[in-house]
């Protein structure tokens, strides 16, 4: 049994790396920028911190089930960054906002409610699984729920400051490239 569990842990670790690589590839293909993809993926370590803290507070050991929760959480955590970065880009491209603090503050405030609503909905959905830790049938789902809940809380709270700050520090060049590409595309379609 120990050997099977160790093999499953190796498989989950490999799948985790593959899922992170795929998330990066999708983000890169969407934004054409490694910088923007990495800013968005900056939420993943923050989510993992919250997950580990939640597992520790719940008295849960790291398991294959919690590792599956980590993989799920990586996708959920990137969603918040995607919402914000996409909105910053749209404000610049379609509403003529220039890069700067005003764009980032406006974009962050306009996306705060949707981010909080989706995080709250997910957290509320996980509460029944977290409440009955010892009940039959929840042995597998409880660690997954604890992992996702803890990571969701930490990623949502810290992301409110991290993504805007990183975009302000490193987002100017990628945004200008996207704006130039859109301008070039308009000129080509005009002819």
Which residues does each predicted region cover?
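C-terminal transmembrane helical bundles of large multi-pass transporters
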Residues: 1-171
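Membrane-proximal cytoplasmic C-terminal regulatory module of class A 7TM GPCRs
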Residues: 169-187
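Intrinsically disordered, low-complexity terminal
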Residues: 189-191
